[in-house]
Amino acid sequence: MKLLKWGFIGCGEVTEKKSGPAFNEIEGSKVIAVMSRNEKKARSYAERHKISKWYTDAQELIDDPDVNAIYIATPPSSHATYAIMAMRAGKPVYVEKPLAANYDDCVRINRVSEQTGIPCFVAYYRRYLPYFKRVKAKLLVR
């Protein structure tokens, strides 16, 4: 199995407590670089999580030859920009919901994914939580 070597764009609460921790807990996946525009935040996050590389520029993280997949956990207004940058660099993208801030940006992301053949996935991790499974089961009964 090829190791997914993730670069995180964004070092906020989602990467700390929600989706982020799982990236190092599953087989074949490791976070190797993080990026925040705030240098102190990027450095602190990397140190606390024993990640060797940190950046303040998204393009530098995307261009890192050791990073082979990108996770975007920033405000939705920046999702399209970062997702398109990563796909154009040939790197698969996993982006926090919502995919983008508006319909036009969603269309742009999908278009670039189709043009490049690089996948872009939305982090709908909650659909597998027990509560949501129960809701789904109740809805399917009707």
Feature map (PLM): residue ranges:
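Beta-loop-alpha module in the N-terminal Rossmann-like domain of NAD(P)-dependent dehydrogenases
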Residues: 52-112
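Alpha-helical structural signal in soluble globular domains
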Residues: 22-26, 45-49, 84-89, 108-116, ...
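A broad helix-preferring feature
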Residues: 9-19, 62-70, 116-118
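Alpha-helical elements of Rossmann-like donor-binding domains used by nucleotide-donor carbohydrate transfer enzymes
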Residues: 18, 44, 60, 69, ...
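A contiguous active-site-proximal alpha/beta segment in oxidoreductase catalytic domains
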Residues: 100-142
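N-terminal Rossmann-like dinucleotide-binding module
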Residues: 1-49
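Short, well-ordered coil/turn segments that N-cap beta-strands
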Residues: 29, 68, 91, 118-119
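Structural detector of well-ordered beta-strand residues that form the stable sheet scaffold
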Residues: 32, 55, 94, 119-121
